[in-house]
Amino acid sequence: MKNVTVYMGPMCNFCDAAKRLLNRNNIPYKEINITIEEDKMHEMLSKSNGKRTIPQIFFDNHHVGGYEELRALEKENKLENLLK
């Protein structure tokens, strides 16, 4: 299974929704709070082609996008294949 990383921040409803979706699908993930780890914000910007919104979600080095993109993958039953 690929490593899942969620770049997120506090008081973020979309971040919470993404984490609930991952938990509901029993997908382990690493949570990075970009407000605490400022260098990680620069890392997120670099990996996501400058996207500043959170969450930004990655499966290994594959940029999934934010919550809406993650939710679309779940609805289309594509999460499992992307994690292989």
Predicted regions and their residues:
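Non-catalytic, surface beta->alpha helical segment in thiol-disulfide oxidoreductase systems
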Residues: 59-84
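Residues that form or flank phosphate/diphosphate-binding pockets in enzymes
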Residues: 16, 39, 65
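Thioredoxin-like thiol-disulfide oxidoreductase module
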Residues: 34-50
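Short glycine-rich loop/turn motifs that provide flexible caps or phosphate-binding loops at active sites
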Residues: 8, 49, 64-65
